[in-house]
Amino acid sequence: PKRYYFLDKSNINTVLDTLDGNSLTEVLKENDTVRNLVNDWLGRFGLKVDVSTLQDVIHKLKIHQNTLDLDITDVGFGISQILPVIVQGFLSFKGSLTMVEQPEIHLHPKMQADLADLFIDVVKSTNNEKKFLLIETHSEYLLRRLRRRIAEGLISSDDIAIYFVSPPKNVDASSEILEKEVAVNGSFEWPEDFYADELKKDTTEFIKHLFLKK
C-alpha cells in the first residue's frame, strides 16, 4: 500500500491491477455498490474503508477503526493484503472466475475462518447468477468454517469442490491432485498428515503431560 494515490478519473475498472493500488482506490471511490458491500463485511471487525481527496487526482485510502482514522499503510499488513481480495470478489461479474492464492497469510485464526463467510457472500452477491472462486489455501480454520456453513445449510455441498495436492514421492514423479468428496452435512475426509492429525496429537500429548505432572 501507498500513502497517496493518483487516480485517473477516466478509468472504469472491473478487474483490479494487482501491481498497483490505484485501481483498488479508484473502485472504492467511484463504485458505491462495491464500497458498501466491502464496508458491510469489514464492519464485522469494527472497520470501515474510505477514500479522501487531497487535491484533484491525489487521494488517500483511509481505514476507520472505532475512533481512529488510519492510512492504509498504518494498519496491519493482513488488512491491506485482504482488502484487494474483498474488493475483487464483489467487483467481479456473474460467471467470472477469481483466483486467490493463500488469502489467510498474516491473518489471525478468527479472520481466517471468516474468510469462508466472505467467499460465500461473494458467490451469492449476484443472486442466482453464480460467480466462481478458485482458492489455494493451507488454512484449516477456513476449511472448518466452510464445513460448518454447509452443515448449517448456508451453502450447498454441490457448490464446493475440495482438492488436496500431494507432493511428488520422488524426483521423477509429479504432484498428485486428490478430490475430496464433500458430504451434504459438510464432512469430508482429511488427507493423511494434514493439520487435523497434528492438532489431535498435540492436544493428546498436552493433556497426557498435564496429568503426568500432577
Q: Model-derived features: where do they sit?
A:
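Coupling/switch segment of ABC-type P-loop NTPase heads
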Residues: 1-41, 203, 207
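Conserved helicase/translocase motor-coupling segment
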Residues: 211-214
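Switch/communication elements of ASCE P-loop NTPase nucleotide-binding domains
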Residues: 30-204
